[in-house]
């Protein structure tokens, strides 16, 4: 059995938030509070090149960070709950 390289498919995206990318391109943001801010190209969101097709933001997320989803050109659906009160510049 050999080892194979696999792209990072989960991690943190804020002090109390986690992200997970499913095999079929669904990005799930979970936890409570604010997302981190990102910038292009030096501090890009970790899912930037993963071909995200759908985003589901969890019920306790309050802020979507700068440039969080700015390069997700394959998006077909985004679910944002009422708990999100701030969407920062260039988030999409």
Range-by-range predicted roles:
Residues 46-47, 63, 67:
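Amphipathic alpha-helical interaction surfaces in cytosolic regulatory modules
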Residues 35-49:
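Acidic/polar low-complexity surface segments
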Residues 20-22, 48:
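Extracellular/periplasmic catalytic domains that process cell-envelope and extracellular macromolecules
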Residues 65-68, 88-91:
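Consensus positions within tandem repeat domains that build extended binding/scaffold surfaces
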């Amino acid at each position: 059995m050999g080892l194979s390289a696999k792209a990072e498919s989960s991690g943190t995206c804020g002090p109390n938030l986690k992200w997970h990318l499913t095999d079929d391109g669904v990005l799930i943001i979970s936890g409570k509070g604010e997302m981190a801010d990102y910038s292009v190209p030096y501090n890009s969101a970790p899912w930037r090149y993963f071909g995200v097709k759908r985003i589901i933001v969890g019920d306790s997320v309050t802020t979507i960070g700068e440039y969080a989803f700015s390069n997700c050109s394959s998006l077909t659906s985004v679910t944002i709950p009422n708990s999100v009160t701030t969407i920062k510049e260039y988030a999409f």
